[in-house]
Amino acid sequence: YWRLGQHVGKVVGDRETLYVLNHPARYKLTVPEAIDRVHEIRRFGWTLDAVEVSDTGLYRPLYDTDEIPLARIATDDAHRPPHFGRAWIEVEAPRDRDAIIRAIRAGDFRTVFASRD
């Protein structure tokens, strides 16, 4: 979202699209600032379905709150090898892009973080 310099992830299915508020931790947003971003992006006419509660695969509990009115997902958002495989979501849905997107929107998934042994 260019007006705020905010990354919004776009996950494309066959008919469904999931939009994710990416990197609130990397932008060092407070929860009120993250909520303001959600409202600003929606005022512009964009849809948001989820917020990233991880940063390079590490859990950021600050954003795992009902105050942010979005599904809370985790990704490793890997840009470098040490970040690969740290975080993901597991969805109970048919192996179909649109079914997976609908399940995420409905909150029918669990967030998983790799153990830090």
Task: Go through each PLM region and give its residues.
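Divalent metal-binding pocket/active-site signature
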Residues: 1-34
